[in-house]
């Protein structure tokens, strides 16, 4: 069961946000200022937040970052907003999508039983004979197609959708450590800088990192932990009159002649810059195993974000599956939040004996080498994980847990770079 934490062994928990509440499918959810919808739902103990598009399998919070498949919700009659990115507001009305009659009891989940009979494009071949059958089937297929419902009643027709323009010297996409470092350097040369980031808070992955800053080009940050240093850097830059920051701006296009297109709230931003810097960072890779989509399976960065940014322990018992040293950092954060670590499962024969691994060994946390996850058990929530040899074969051991963390490396976000024909 997830819960709020008042203290953590390795950092100071921010408890300054005042308590607010909102509705989720008609039920009251308590949150703190600074929470996203997703983090508030996790803190309330909710496991299922959505249903998969076709088979209506239950979905939980996966990466808490807006890049998972689970976080589309309707907020105040506006459909398809990312619960991982939308900040909780007092009194807001949030509804889940793609389920009937309810999120926890979705009759369309029966589709999951008929997976072998519903391959991709099945509707092109089925229901066409006899001829009278297709018009009936077509109506039913159209009912289940698409996600979210448009506000056809016009209850919020006062919303305005504008087109706005900016002409900075430098446009930086990404407000993580690289983007902020680039902004600081450009501002030092007297440039007009526009910084766009798709999250409510600047800082990227450094917001949930305990690692110590070393060999920094900025001497004032040397020796600080990353989460302290990045907040200090962001606070310093925000007061610069030559910098405009657009938090929560989703950049969706980079075109010829340095034209950048973004959605910022309800506005379409068209930005023409002398230079464009892409500092879009990376996201967690996915681990393939049986039932890897069940509620209770999360990425490492998603877990770290819940703990360090929102002060939430996402489970009672956890297993961490990793392929690199970063998995030990996540495991240490879980331990510091009071989560019982059943095992750290490392696919490598040996690591680099980093500081986080050494701390876990001193805490007598079981570490299994050359192993990985084989199968997850549970339907509406994770109940057990089977682990075994990386090369396959029989599972070696099973662990009862309500959280499986996958830390299997990062993949750079190259979409905008590819679109802009970058190399």
Task: Give the label of every model feature segment.
Residues 2-423:
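Residues forming the flavin
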């Amino acid at each position: 069961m997830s819960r709020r934490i008042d203290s953590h062994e390795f950092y100071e928990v921010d408890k300054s946000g005042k308590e607010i509440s909102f509705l989720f499918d008609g039920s009251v959810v308590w949150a703190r200022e600074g929470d996203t919808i997703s983090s508030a739902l996790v803190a309330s103990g909710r496991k299922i937040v959505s249903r998969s598009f076709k088979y209506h399998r239950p979905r939980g919070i996966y990466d808490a970052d807006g890049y998972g498949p689970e976080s589309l919700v309707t907020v105040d009659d506006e459909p398809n907003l990312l619960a991982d990115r939308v900040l909780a507001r007092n009194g807001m009305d949030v509804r889940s999508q793609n389920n009937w009659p309810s999120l926890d009891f979705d009759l369309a989940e029966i589709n999951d039983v008929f997976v072998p009979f519903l391959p991709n494009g099945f509707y092109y071949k089925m229901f066409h004979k006899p001829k009278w059958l297709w018009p009936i089937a077509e109506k039913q297929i159209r009912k289940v197609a698409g996600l979210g419902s448009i506000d056809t009643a016009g209850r919020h027709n006062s919303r305005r959708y504008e087109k706005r323009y900016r002409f900075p010297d430098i446009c930086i996409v990404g407000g993580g450590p690289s983007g902020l470092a680039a902004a600081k350097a450009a501002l030092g040369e007297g440039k007009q800088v526009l910084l766009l980031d798709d999250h409510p808070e600047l800082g990227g992955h450094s917001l949930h990192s305990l690692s110590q800053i070393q060999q920094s080009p900025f001497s004032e940050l040397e020796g600080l932990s990353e989460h302290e240093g990045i907040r200090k850097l962001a606070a310093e830059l925000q007061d610069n009159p030559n910098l405009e920051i657009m938090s929560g701006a989703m950049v969706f296009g980079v075109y010829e002649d340095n034209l950048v297109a973004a959605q910022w709230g309800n506005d379409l931003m068209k930005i023409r810059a002398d230079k464009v810097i892409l500092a879009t960072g990376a996201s967690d890779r996915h681990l393939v195993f049986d039932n890897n989509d069940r509620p209770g399976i999360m990425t490492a960065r998603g877990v770290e974000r819940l703990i360090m940014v929102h002060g939430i322990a996402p489970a009672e018992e956890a297993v961490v599956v990793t392929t690199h040293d970063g998995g030990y950092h996540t495991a240490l954060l879980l331990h510091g939040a009071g989560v019982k670590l059943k095992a750290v499962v490392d696919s490598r024969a040996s690591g680099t004996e980093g500081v986080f691994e050494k701390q876990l060994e001193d805490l007598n946390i079981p570490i299994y080498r050359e192993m990985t996850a084989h199968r997850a058990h549970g339907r509406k929530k994770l109940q057990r994980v089977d682990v075994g040899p990386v090369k396959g074969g029989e599972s070696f051991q099973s662990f009862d847990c309500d959280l499986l963390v996958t830390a299997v490396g990062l993949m750079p976000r190259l979409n905008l770079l590819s679109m802009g024909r970058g190399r």
